[in-house]
Amino acid sequence: MNMESIKNVIEIVKKPSNQFEYEEHYYFTGVNLGFNGTTIEMTGDVWEAAKFKDMTSNEAAAWCNFIKAILGKRYEINIKNISLTYNL
């Protein structure tokens, strides 16, 4: 999947603080994914976007792989308030 096919559900905002650091925010139906180059933090209504509470670990891992495919890089994903952490 490429960026063009998901641009209608994702908003990307880059806020350079200097030449080495940046932030990007991806919006999935009420869920905010923010990362700083090392960690992704998920906040918002996770149920609406990924239904993590009812997902099996395999399903949740598959969704995290979807996120990884979008980002095109390897990141640690910390799912806040759900107690799921996946190292991609």
What spans do the regions from the language model cover?
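Short, Lys/Arg-enriched, disordered terminal segments
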Residues: 1-6, 86-88
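Short, mixed-charge low-complexity intrinsically disordered segments
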Residues: 48-88
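Short aromatic-glycine-(Arg/Gly/Cys) micro-motifs in beta-strand/loop hairpins
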Residues: 4-48
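Intrinsically disordered, low-complexity boundary segments flanking structured domains
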Residues: 1, 35-40, 64-69
